[in-house]
Design a protein with these regions (language model features):
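N-terminal Rossmann NAD(P)H-binding glycine-rich loop of SDR-like oxidoreductase domains
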Residues: 2-27
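Structural motif
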Residues: 7, 45-46, 81
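SDR active-site strand-loop-helix element
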Residues: 11, 50, 82-88, 92, ...
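Catalytic helix-loop patch of NAD(P)-dependent Rossmann-fold dehydrogenases
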Residues: 67, 95-132, 136, 143-144
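Conserved Rossmann-fold NAD(P)-dependent oxidoreductase catalytic core, especially the SDR/UDP-sugar
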Residues: 70-109
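NAD(P)-dependent short-chain dehydrogenase/reductase
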Residues: 119-170, 176
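C-terminal substrate-binding subdomain of Rossmann-fold SDR/epimerase-dehydratase oxidoreductases
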Residues: 164-166, 172-271
Length: 271
């Protein structure tokens, strides 16, 4: 581990992205360390908060009870950088490709609550605050109530992937491994402000599903509705300039095929 990496602390490291960051060599800890006196080591210069409040997206969510507010207080008191893992959901229905300058007009509770937390922490931390608005991350995640997790469960259990939208619906998908690599690179020298994190590639959901089935070795894709719904792609120009990291359509589809093969083998530990 480099000295630079040692100056970063991943809190909420038990989640999907948190574990991936720790797997890249970043020190991690549960979010409970934020409540402990001296819990954040003296050598830390940057906190990446990778935890998620279980109430987020629900009516009973309270930002005062979200531990991310505690992380922000520690960062402000000690002059640390804080990297927030936000979501493309804060943009709502903004036209694609969505730039960081697009107005934030979230259309659901999750997006509205994420945006409210962004503004709350920005006011407190100023230039020491970096917001990463992340596209659709996918990994080997059967059992998770995510788009990709539900897709894997149904393929394994029923031999099919079922959509309630057109398979031509294009979205910005990014493999978990690439997401973690990009976040780590940005956290080594936090730029401040907003950075979109995604592939920047409008990939048809049907193509992603077919790649998973190719890896699995079988399966069928069925659709109960032909409506194109929630298409989006992020403009990742700033991410490219800051990290030098680029994704390709082939890399995304290869990751999906590998996940399908892993599902067939049944040997990996679910996320």
């Amino acid at each position: 581990m480099s000295n630079d990496a040692a100056s970063i602390l991943v809190t909420g490291a038990g989640g999907l992205i948190g574990r991936a960051l720790v797997g890249l060599g970043l020190p991690g800890c549960p979010h409970t360390v934020l409540h402990e006196t001296g819990g954040v080591p003296a050598g830390v210069r940057t906190i990446i908060h990778a935890g998620r409040d279980p109430r987020l997206g629900k009516a009973d969510y309270d930002p005062d009870r979200d531990v991310e507010s505690v992380a922000a207080k520690i960062a402000a008191d000690r002059g640390l950088d804080l990297v927030m893992l936000s979501s493309r959901k804060v943009y709502g229905d903004a036209p694609s490709p969505v730039t960081e300058e697009a107005p934030a007009r979230p259309t659901d509770d999750y997006g509205r609550q994420k945006r409210a937390m962004e503004m709350r922490l920005q006011e407190r931390l100023g230039a020491k605050f970096t917001i990463l608005r992340i596209a659709n991350v996918f990994s080997f995640e059967p059992g998770r109530r995510s788009f990709f997790g539900i897709m894997l469960d149904r393929l394994r259990d029923c031999g099919e992937i079922r959509f309630d939208m057109s398979p031509d619906t294009a979205r910005d998908f990014i493999p978990l491994t690439a997401t973690a690599e990009i976040i780590r690179t940005l956290a080594l020298s936090p730029p401040g402000g907003i950075v979109n994190v995604g592939s920047g590639i409008p990939l048809a959901t049907g193509d992603l599903a077919r790649a998973v089935m190719d890896g699995f070795g079988s399966g069928r894709l069925t659709c109960t509705d032909d409506t194109i719904r929630d298409s989006f792609v992020l403009d990742v120009t700033r991410m490219h300039s800051l990290t030098g990291l680029h994704l390709t359509r082939d890399r995304i589809l290869a990751a999906a095929r590998t996940i399908g093969a892993t599902l067939k083998a049944g040997t990996a530990t679910p996320a």
